[in-house]
Swiss-Prot record:
Segments of skewed composition (Basic residues): 122-132
Organism of provenance: Medicago truncatula (Barrel medic)
Job of this protein: Involved in the infection process during the plant-rhizobium interaction. Involved in actinorhizal root nodulation. Involved in symbiotic association with the nitrogen-fixing actinomycete Frankia spp.
Region entry Disordered, spans: 28-174
A cellular component term, taken from the record's GO annotations: extracellular region
Keywords associated with the record: Cell wall, Nodulation, Secreted, Signal
Pro residues: compositionally biased ranges: 53-65, 134-150, 159-174
Record localization: Secreted, Cell wall
GO annotation (BP), single: nodulation
InterPro entries to which the protein is assigned, alphabetical: Proline-rich_CW_protein
Protein name, as recorded: Early nodulin-11
Sequence similarity: Belongs to the plant proline-rich protein superfamily.
Length: 174
């Protein structure tokens, strides 16, 4: 009985000696799993190494494509399948006919003929005025006044007049 106990203890000891140098004894299954990409961030951005949620990258939905028009399926075997009609060609563009009568003229009435230009009469000069402006016609204009006899014009002399006129200078008494 004691030998069996010693034998099992020896096996455990030997297994521990072989597993420790290989580096497999201290590893748990949680260390062997790959890191979760959602909760991993660089250390320089998260120095405390707390779990940070990185949302997944948004992908837009695929673009909408309209369904392709298919020819209608003919279920009756006797009838021919209905074909889609091609679009009709456009008629060629025609210019409108030119108007033979003026606009807003009834059709039974003929438009008036253009009259030839008459020669203009020669221009006459207006008659000259016989009386002054702003004078009533029954009143005669005043006659010009005769010139007044004026004395002949004298030239100014350059001589200085005497300081006291024609009187003698006053006597000064000391």
């Amino acid at each position: 009985m004691a030998s069996f106990f010693l034998y099992s203890l020896g096996l455990v000891f030997l297994s521990a000696l072989t597993l420790v140098p290989l580096g497999l004894a201290d590893k748990s299954p949680s260390h062997n799993m790959p890191p979760n990409p959602i909760y991993t961030t660089p250390i320089h951005k998260n120095p405390t190494n707390t779990p940070v949620y990185n949302p997944p990258i948004y992908k837009p939905p695929p673009t909408y494509k309209p369904p392709i028009k298919k020819q209608p399926i003919n279920k009756s075997p006797n009838k021919k399948p209905l074909l889609l009609k091609p679009p009709l060609p456009k008629p060629p563009h025609k210019e409108p006919p030119s108007r033979k009568r003026p606009i807003n003229t009834p059709p039974d009435k003929k438009p008036p003929l253009l009259k030839p230009p008459f020669p203009k009469p020669p221009q006459k000069k207006p008659p000259s005025r016989k009386r002054p402006i702003n004078t009533p016609p029954n009143k005669k204009p005043p006659l010009p006044k005769p010139p007044v006899n004026k004395p002949p014009h004298k030239k100014p002399s350059n001589k200085r007049p005497p300081p006291y006129g024609n009187q003698p200078p006053p006597s000064i008494h000391f």
